[in-house]
Amino acid sequence: MRVILLGAPGAGKGTQAQLIMEHFGIPQISTGDMLRAAVKAGTPLGLQAKDIMASGGLVSDDLIIALVKERISSSDCSNGFLFDGFPRTIPQAEALLEADVHIDHVIEIHVPDEEIVARLSGRRVHEASGRVYHIIHNAPRVEGHDDVTGEPLVQRPDDHEATVRKRLAVYHEQTEPLVGFYQKLVAEGKVKAPKYTRINGIGSVDSIRQQLLDVLR
C-alpha cells in the first residue's frame, strides 16, 4: 500500500493521513523528517544534505529522491508507506517515476478554496493549553474566551485570511498541477501509473475516512 495524499492546506490531509497509517500499519514519510533523520544518522546522503543546507542551499530533487529510496527500503516500509507533502512539484513526481518508485494510489482530498478559508480563518486558540475553537463549528461559550479558564483566545498568524489565501495560491501554482500529471498518466495507460482518485473533503471526519478506505481496500 503505497499512497500519495494530495490536497490544499486545510483540506484535512493530516487527520486522514493519521487514520490511514493506523488502519494499514504503514509509516507516514515527510521529506523534512527524512532529511533530519538522515543528517542525524550521519549517512552519506545525510552528510551531503547537511553540507548543502549549512551553506544555505536547497537540497536537489536528485538527492531527495535518493533519500526517499533509502527510506522506503527500511523494514517498516515493507507493507507500504504514505507520502506526506511529497512530491510537491511535477519535476519531483517525474523523478519519482524515473527512479522506479512504485505508487499504488494517488488520492486528492478536494475542498473548495472558500471553504478552506472559512475553516482556517475561523480558528481560535487558547495558547496556554492548546485548545482549539472555531467561531462557527466549535464556538466557545463566551465569544473570544476559553471555556475552561476564561482567558482570551487568539488567532494564529497562519490562520489570518490573507495568509491562508497566500498558501492556497502557492498550492495552486506549485502542487495542484500534480493532479493533472497523475490523471494524464492514468489516461495514457502508463504501466507505472497509480490509481488516481478525487474524494470530496467536505463532510465529517468519519465519512471522509470511509471514502478513503473504500478506495484503498
UniProtKB/Swiss-Prot annotation:
Domain text: Consists of three domains, a large central CORE domain and two small peripheral domains, NMPbind and LID, which undergo movements during catalysis. The LID domain closes over the site of phosphoryl transfer upon ATP binding. Assembling and dissambling the active center during each catalytic cycle provides an effective means to prevent ATP hydrolysis.
Entry's Gene Ontology cellular component terms: cytoplasm
EC number assigned by the record: 2.7.4.3
Record pathway: Purine metabolism; AMP biosynthesis via salvage pathway; AMP from ADP: step 1/1
Compartment(s) of residence: Cytoplasm
Function recorded in the entry: Catalyzes the reversible transfer of the terminal phosphate group between ATP and AMP. Plays an important role in cellular energy homeostasis and in adenine nucleotide metabolism.
Known catalytic reactions: AMP + ATP = 2 ADP
Domain of life from the UniProt record: Bacteria
CDD domains with a match to the protein in the record: ADK
Region (LID): 122-159
Region: NMP, residue numbers: 30-59
Enzyme class: transferase
UniProt similarity note: Belongs to the adenylate kinase family.
Pfam families: ADK (PF00406), ADK_lid (PF05191)
Stated name of the protein: Adenylate kinase
GO process annotations (BP): AMP salvage
InterPro entries linked to this entry: Adenyl_kin_sub, Adenylat/UMP-CMP_kin, Adenylat_kinase_CS, Adenylate_kinase_lid-dom, P-loop_NTPase
Residues annotated for ATP binding in this entry: G10, A11, G12, K13, G14, T15, R123, V132, Y133, G203
Assembly, per entry: Monomer.
Keywords: ATP-binding, Cytoplasm, Kinase, Nucleotide biosynthesis, Nucleotide-binding, Transferase
An annotated Gene Ontology molecular function: ATP binding
